Amino acid sequence: MVLMIVSGRSGSGKSVALRALEDMGFYCVDNLPVVLLPDLARTLADREISAAVSIDVRNMPESPEIFEQAMSNLPDAFSPQLLFLDADRNTLIRRYSDTRRLHPLSNKNLSLESAIDKESDLLEPLRSRADLIVDTSEMSVHELAEMLRTRLLGKRERELTMVFESFGFKHGIPIDADYVFDVRFLPNPHWDPKLRPMTGLDKPVAAFLDRHTEVHNFIYQTRSYLELWLPMLETNNRSYLTVAIGCTGGKHRSVYIAEQLADYFRSRGKNVQSRHRTLEKRKP
């Protein structure tokens, strides 16, 4: 397991890096005192989960020996790595000007320029020990996150999870949906007394819908639309794409079509989840 220690000058992108690591499955803690690193690692060792901790000038130990002692007390299960982020002086000044945030050392009656220089001196023990130093001066937020994924996971983009969810319009549109498709115009199994108590997961309902050309056309055109834009969505620094399929009650048509789309993209090697809001509400 990895214990990733993220440090660097304020404004260099530590918060961005920590969020990217969290998206990669790391257990993340912001500004943990160095002396508590071994305790955190021992707590997480049983859970077999990698961790990432940010350290900035506010929680730097008084001497380098304290940091070295904390590193030596880590459980053997953890492999510590130190990532140090930096940016040139003018870039840091511009970022502080843009965000209008206070520098952590600004309460010491220092100008912003002096605070940045003082911070460099205080962080030098960590910088000199870093396994990887990244200059973020010319990087966007997305580029920094992408670079970390490439270095740590060996692939450029994070894996997008496609979520296909069915719902009933009479219960309201899901607020987490990226795309909403209305299938109330398709033939409705509800009007067949034998099919009414069933759901879109049952074979007789599936057979009923499968007999209609318009159902096939809708599924084909919807998946073609998603396939067209999926490459761009996968490189858009997002974790989930939620596609909501709605019919009147959320029981028959929307369930069947959500499952058909989920099966199609799952067969193409995509990371897919499916859920059915109305059916989940009916569970005891």
UniProtKB/Swiss-Prot annotation:
One of its GO terms (molecular function) is RNA binding. Residues 266-284 are annotated as: RNA-binding. Pfam families: PapZ_C (PF22740), RapZ-like_N (PF03668). ATP binds at G8, R9, S10, G11, S12, G13, K14, S15. Keywords: ATP-binding, GTP-binding, Nucleotide-binding, RNA-binding. Gene3D superfamilies: P-loop containing nucleotide triphosphate hydrolases. The keyword Nucleotide-binding applies. The keyword ATP-binding applies. GTP binds at D56, V57, R58, N59. Belongs to the RapZ-like family. RapZ subfamily. Homotrimer. This is RNase adapter protein RapZ. It comes from Shigella dysenteriae serotype 1 (strain Sd197).
